[in-house]
Amino acid sequence: MGYDDVITHLGEFGPYQKRIYYLLCLPAIVCAFHKLAGVFLLAKPDFRCALPYENGSIYELSPHLWNLSYPENERCSYYDVDYTEEYLNGSIPRSSNETKTCSSYVYDRSKYLNSAVTEWNLVCSRSLLSATSDSLFMLGVLLGSLIFGQMSDKLGRKPTFFASLVLQLIFGVLAAVAPEYFSYTISRMIVGATTSGVFLVAYVIALEMVGSSYRLFAGVAMQMFFSVGFMLTAGFAYFIHDWRWLQIAITLPGLLFLCYYWIIPESARWLLMKGRKDEAFVIIEKAAKENKVEVPNEIYEQLVDEVAEKKKQDEMAASQPAATVFDLLRYPNLRRKTLLIFFDWFVNSGVYYGLSWNTNNLGGNQLVNFMISGAVEIPGYTLLLFTLNRWGRRSILCGTMMVAGISLLATIFVPSDMNWLIVACAMIGKLAITSSYGTIYIFSAEQFPTVVRNVGLGASSMVARVGGILAPYLKLLGEIWRPLPLIICGALSLTAGLLSLLLPETLNKPMPETIEDGENFGKKPAPQETAEEGGTQELSGMLNGKSG
């Protein structure tokens, strides 16, 4: 008897669960605002050096004046000459080819009235600061997953959700009024941390209250709400051209979720784990009433017994050495699978965010590119609902990553004047990597043994965040050669897809429970039976020696 059996009596996805679930999906939209708005907050418009004779700030110059003032393909310096009227009229030749570094800039404000880049001149020698700001935001996401993950397990899902939501509101506004780059970046980093508290905790509450047969749908559908937020971010940027007002606009919708304090319950599953059975039973009874079902009294009695038994098991487990990531790296087959999974997580996160933040470098309408990049995620996630339990996890993971790699690498051969085809290849890659990213969550959970599953998933998530932290620097490479970010993402995706063929399929296979199960899972049989038996006995001896 377990809590999943209680959900079976309540209805795996009854009216009560649906109401709470869809309310919990809405914060994913706001978290998408914060994660992706950096594309517009730190938008880099066309720019040039302000020339010594200029008093205005009009970006456009005639081709004649441009050739007289700037070296070819150079935006961060200008010719160090005497800009007299005769020189500008072309009456006298240029006296020197020496250049001078810019001290101020003129920006093309036809698309962006004001961004953090234009306000603090984050171009040329300071362009690295723009990518660093996004990178530190993703570092905040990593730290938030560690901090708020621990908080939600110890203090509860609901308090953690609202603590992170309040912090998100406060530091979202502080980022908008930041007087300089440093305070803006720190505020945004804290906002990044809170997205883990808001989104991931809501995700956990939602999945903990639905039945097992609906969890794939529930997990994928919540990701689709994130994709909706992705697209809506472009809508905000279309109407709001000043970065400070844009930051406020994406923050204020979070105020609506404060009313959830009186609507969203604590996770009954978590309450039972903590021995707070009376509070859990109140929530179960409320759900039963709304679902118009009755939960038999013996169910509650069995739950009480289970809670007592679980407490004993936890006390026994606490006396044993805690599982660590080194347990996954100790044995050859398990180590090989773990490193492959880590690489898949790194690539999926890096490529996903690399493509999401690179839409401004694709050419064409930047807002349209960004919106399409969010829209293609919907079919990417929908694909999983119809294929993941039919075709297998490995087939989907490898197939989607290879499709992403091939489509992105194909941009090498696309002529520069066929911009629509470059965008199309990039969006096919984005759709495919979205499907891959959704698959790796399930696939890796089924690869790790039960005794170290949480450790393995936590380590995988951290490796993924490293990919996200590095992703903002990819778009800087587009200044060297525009297709370069797509080529790097494509090469990584194709490599990871091919290497994933070395992982065993997990569909309809029992998940490994012990370290020994994990080591043997997917291992090729030895050529001789005696060799196989000897290897198994040796491994068992190693494991028994470790546990002793």
Curated annotation (Swiss-Prot):
User: What glycosylation sites does the entry record?
Assistant: 55, 67, 89, 97
| Chain ranges on the Extracellular side, renumbered to this chain | 44-127, 180-189, 241-244, 359-366, 417-419, 475-482
Record PROSITE patterns: MFS
- Spans traversing the lipid bilayer: 23-43, 128-148, 159-179, 190-210, 220-240, 245-265, 338-358, 367-387, 396-416, 420-440, 454-474, 483-503
* GO terms, molecular function: transmembrane transporter activity
Q: Where is this region: Disordered?
A: 512-548
Q: Name one GO biological process term.
A: apoptotic process
Q: Which keywords has UniProt assigned to this entry?
A: Glycoprotein, Ion transport, Membrane, Transmembrane, Transmembrane helix, Transport
Task: List cystine links.
Answer: none
What is the membrane topology listed in the Swiss-Prot or TrEMBL record?
Multi-pass membrane protein
State the GO CC annotations: membrane
Cytoplasmic compartment segments: 1-22, 149-158, 211-219, 266-337, 388-395, 441-453, 504-548
Entry's localization field: Membrane
Q: In which tissues is it expressed?
A: Expressed in embryos and adults at low level. Expressed at higher level in third instar larvae.
The protein's matches in CDD domains, at most eight in alphabetical order, are given as: MFS_SLC22
SUPFAM superfamilies from the entry?
MFS general substrate transporter
**What functional role does this protein have?**
Probably transports organic cations.
**Entry's family note:** Belongs to the major facilitator (TC 2.A.1) superfamily. Organic cation transporter (TC 2.A.1.19) family.
Name this polypeptide is given: Organic cation transporter protein
